Amino acid sequence: MGHGADAENTTAATVRERLETVGATDVATTLQALATPSRLRILARLQEGPCAATELADAVGMEQSACSHQLRLLRNLGLVTGERRGRSVIYALYDNHVAELLEQALHHVEHLRLGLRDAPVTAEAAGAR
């Protein structure tokens, strides 16, 4: 996961503690940013690599103004970056965490559709980590 966070050693208690430290509202705001199909399409395209705003709008089938509005929101939330190059702004995912969020959401929905379920983590197993 990066930044010293080891998913294998994270217990439910530490996730709760971290949520209180970071702020549940900030985490909810980040997740809400993923709550529209247009933003998900933008992030999915940017997962393939950086892209100019005009090309991005075409790639995701949006009007330029609507795409720019969504990009501004995603940028303000720290999910994408924008770098001016001449007359264009090149957008990219902020970091690999954004790609991981998208990948995990897709993986979860695919599991739901297939009726699959990961083995639940028991309190005993979590303590043994």
Tell me what each language-model feature is.
Residues 50-51, 75, 106:
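Residue-level detector of secondary-structure transition/capping positions
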Residues 70:
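Residues within the DNA-recognition helix of helix-turn-helix
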